[in-house]
């Protein structure tokens, strides 16, 4: 798994690719989020467009990251989850914990509600 980091306004976008599974990504994701939270950067958008698979450990890493960000007044939101991941989040009622955004602009607007975002 690889993670590329970029900043857009007040949020950090993590472009994630590969698999988020036990021993193959979930630890890397937790570490990346933890490091950002230690820097006070708690508004995170995970771009999941290139994520091939997420197992239960990966799902746990997503939920744990979301809860950690909330404790710091931020949030972890998802962009472009696979249909399978979206269905899994829906069936497990985790969409109440992790918001899925339709676009980077929508995510940025949700983090910065008073900012007008060009579409």
Task: List the model feature ranges, each with a label.
Residues 20-98:
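Amphipathic alpha-helical interaction surfaces in cytosolic regulatory modules
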Residues 8-10, 83, 105:
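Residues that form or immediately flank small-molecule/cofactor binding pockets and catalytic motifs
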Residues 10, 94-97, 103:
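Glycine-centered tight turns that cap/initiate beta-strands
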């Amino acid at each position: 798994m690889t993670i590329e980091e970029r900043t857009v306004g007040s949020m950090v976008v993590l472009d994630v690719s590969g698999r988020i599974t036990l021993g193959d990504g979930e630890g890397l994701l937790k570490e990346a989020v933890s490091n950002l939270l230690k820097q006070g950067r708690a508004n995170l958008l995970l771009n999941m467009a290139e994520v091939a698979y997420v197992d239960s450990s990966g799902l746990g890493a997503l939920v744990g990251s979301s809860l950690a960000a909330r404790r710091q007044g931020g949030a972890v939101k998802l962009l472009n989850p696979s249909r399978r991941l979206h269905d899994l989040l829906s069936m497990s009622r985790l969409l109440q914990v992790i918001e899925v955004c339709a676009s980077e602009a929508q995510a940025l607007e949700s983090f910065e509600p008073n900012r007008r975002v060009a579409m």
